[in-house]
Amino acid sequence: MKQVLFLYNPQSGKGKIEKDSQAIGEMFRQAGYSIVDGPIDFSRNPFNGHETVDLVVVAGGDGTVNYVVNRMKEKHLDLLLGIIPAGTANDFAGALGMEKNPVKAAAQLLGGTEERVDCGRVNDHYFVNIFSFGIFTTTSQRTPDKRKHQIGKLAYLIEGVKEFRSVHGIPLQILADGKAFDLESLMALIFNGETAGGFHLAPRSSIKDGMFDCLLLQRRNMLFSVVSMLRHLLGGRPSQVKHFRARTLDITSPINEPTDVDGQKAVSYTHLRAHETKANL
């Protein structure tokens, strides 16, 4: 009998996944799986004692998926992974084409086919959707879970407005696939997926092409910067938004800037190396 490890984060999204978890578990049992399930204990590696399962199903947001993938890579495992969207934004699940309803997504997994997709890595940390730093990029870290549960994605917007008070330029030296350039940026977004917080910022990105889509918002006055990003969201090509694609990136800055991976707090860097690992998941 095949075995599935079903991991869910009861704090993700509006906390509804705990109610759905019983129905999802029963669906896999009916499909002939032996199931090990339960809420994720973030103080330990969930793969301890479960290194040989046939399938890992993760129900949560991008941060939960990030945690599970990093713990899996920590043990050098290459297990079949299924994603059930249960967070606030669920950007990576969206890139995979998953149903938004968790129970429907579980049915989709049971009837689906195996595919290999890309995974990003920055220094020693993996990310499935986005690595970022600068204005607005740490908003999700500072948005209270209670507010996210109450009003969903709108909570990110409210928290993001507060960042206008602390906006600053970040001097960057960048080497992208061997091409060097310098600029002062307000924000840097390195996409494996195509959305951030549900916003389609890199619509031409693909999780199967072995490439990052990179967006850098160059420093100008704040109003012009906001207008430029809005134009980009609407499909325009403002000169202030530098958009390029690369397999590897070396970025150096004199500022030890806080960073974000898949909506979670990451280490601050003055030098980082990011590379796309094609078909790594």
What is each of the regions a protein language model found here?
Residues 35, 160-169, 208-256:
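Catalytic phosphate-donor-binding core of small-molecule kinases
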Residues 17, 67-70, 93-94, 199-200, ...:
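Short glycine-/acidic-enriched loop or helix-start segments at secondary-structure transitions
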Residues 1-59, 66, 70-71, 104:
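ATP/NTP phosphate-donor binding region
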Residues 5-7, 31-39, 74-189:
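Catalytic core of DAGKc-family lipid kinases
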Residues 137-139, 182-184, 196-199, 223-225:
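Short acidic/glycine-rich loop or secondary-structure boundary segments that cap or lie
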Residues 24, 68, 92-93, 139, ...:
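Hydrophobic packing residues within well-ordered alpha-helices of enzyme cores
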Residues 270-277:
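Conserved small/polar residues in nucleotide/adenosyl-binding loops
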Residues 189-201:
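Glycine-rich phosphate/pyrophosphate-binding beta-alpha loops
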